[in-house]
Design a protein with these regions (language model features):
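ATP-dependent carboxylate/acyl-activation modules
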Residues: 1-249
C-alpha cells in the first residue's frame, strides 16, 4: 500500500475577475492546479491550500467569520469555488458533519478529516507554547504563520520553538510501485509525519530551481519551458539540479 496522500486542488482566477460568478458547474473555470503530497490527509490538504498562492494558508478565512450558520450552509450547498473555507468555518463552530453532508452531499469521510483539523486548532489554542502540540500541528499540516496566529505570537517565535525541539521535516521518496517491487525515483516530498530521511545527499555542488507554481492569468506553460532549459544548463555545467515546485509538471 502507499504511505502518502496526494491532493490536487484547482487554481481559480477569480482574483483577476472579481465580478465573475464563482459557482461551479460543467463549465471549466480553473486555469491550473496544484499538487501536494503528505503522510496524512490533513497534512496533504493544508499543503495544497498554501500552494495555491492566493493568500490563504488555512481552511478558515476571515471573510466567513461574520456569516450565520444558515448563510454558510446555503452557500456551501451551491458549490462555490471557495466552499472549502465555508465548511471549515461551519466545522469550527461545531456543526454536525452529518447535517453538512445532508445539505451539500459531500462525503462524511472528507468532512470528518476537515473536522480533525478544526478540532485540533482549538486544542492548539488551549496549549500555547506546547512542544507536543506544535509537533502534532506540523504533522497535520499547519504552517508556522497559522500556528503563530492561533497562539497570538510571531512566526519567528514558532520557528525558534521548532528549532529548539528539533521539529523538522524529512524528505520521503514517492513510491510509484506501491511497494510491489523495489524502485528508485528522484522524486521527494517533505513531511513532518516521519523520522527517516530518504533523500540521499551527494557531495556535488547543487543549484535549486524554484518552479513557477500553478498556472494562472499571466503565468503559463512558458515558465515550465524555462525551468526545463534551466535544468539542462545546470547539468551541462556539472552541477546537481534540484527542482522545488508545488505543481506536477
Amino acid at each position: 500500500t502507499l504511505d502518502y496522500v496526494v491532493t490536487k486542488m484547482p487554481r481559480f482566477p477569480f482574483d483577476k475577475f472579481p465580478t465573475a460568478s464563482n459557482y461551479l458547474s460543467t463549465q471549466m473555470k480553473a486555469t491550473g492546479e496544484v499538487m501536494s503530497v503528505g503522510r496524512s490527509w490533513e497534512e496533504s490538504l493544508q499543503k495544497a491550500v498554501r500552494s495555491l498562492e492566493d493568500g490563504k494558508d488555512a481552511i478558515r478565512i476571515p471573510r466567513f467569520e461574520s456569516w450565520s450558520d444558515s448563510e454558510l450552509l446555503d452557500y456551501a450547498a451551491k458549490s462555490p469555488a471557495d466552499r472549502l473555507y465555508a465548511l471549515g468555518e461551519l466545522l469550527h463552530r461545531g456543526m454536525d458533519p452529518a447535517r453538512i453532508c445532508d445539505a451539500t452531499a459531500i462525503s462524511i469521510f472528507f468532512l470528518s478529516k476537515l473536522k480533525n483539523i478544526t478540532q485540533f486548532e482549538e486544542e492548539l489554542r488551549q496549549n500555547v507554547g506546547s512542544a507536543d502540540h506544535l509537533r502534532e500541528a506540523k504533522r497535520l499540516g499547519f504552517s508556522d504563520p497559522s500556528i503563530a496566529r492561533i497562539w497570538n505570537t510571531t512566526e519567528r517565535a514558532v520557528y525558534d520553538l521548532r528549532m529548539k525541539e528539533n521539529i523538522l521535516p524529512v524528505y520521503k521518496m514517492i513510491d510509484t510501485c506501491a511497494s510491489e517491487f523495489e524502485s528508485y525515483v528522484p522524486y521527494f516530498y517533505s513531511t513532518y509525519g516521519g523520522s527517516e530521511n530518504e533523500s540521499v545527499v551527494t557531495d556535488r555542488k547543487k543549484v535549486i530551481v524554484l518552479g513557477s507554481g500553478p498556472i494562472r492569468i499571466g503565468q503559463g506553460v512558458e515558465f515550465d519551458y524555462s525551468t526545463v532549459h534551466a535544468l539542462r544548463t545546470i547539468r551541462a555545467q556539472g552541477y546537481e539540479a534540484i527542482v522545488i515546485n508545488n505543481r506536477a509538471n
